[in-house]
């Protein structure tokens, strides 16, 4: 699927128990030897009230991403095709994201306020900011 210039491999895992490992994720995302994508997204079922689905996100290097706004819009689009509702809630590692169907081709998501303070942005290693 494509969302605002990003491309995703989306796996609907709601009716199965597929478990992917990092090497498999990297291979799927590889543009030369796999399908190729910016991120791999897995949609899982969810038994919580008012939650339509649970989503997991991986970057093409196999690392976990807590969420992705564009990928969440793609997942919401799939869910909207299955139901008449105009709002779905998708649970991610960053919490529940509320998604709205604006019309047949427009989906909006509320991913919250951006983190702009340097100490709120995760880094791969500790570094001095001075």
Per-range role (PLM):
Residues 1-103:
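A glycine-rich beta-to-alpha transition motif near the start of alpha/beta enzyme domains, typified by
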Residues 84, 91-130:
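ATP-dependent small-molecule kinase catalytic core of the GHMP/sugar-kinase superfamily
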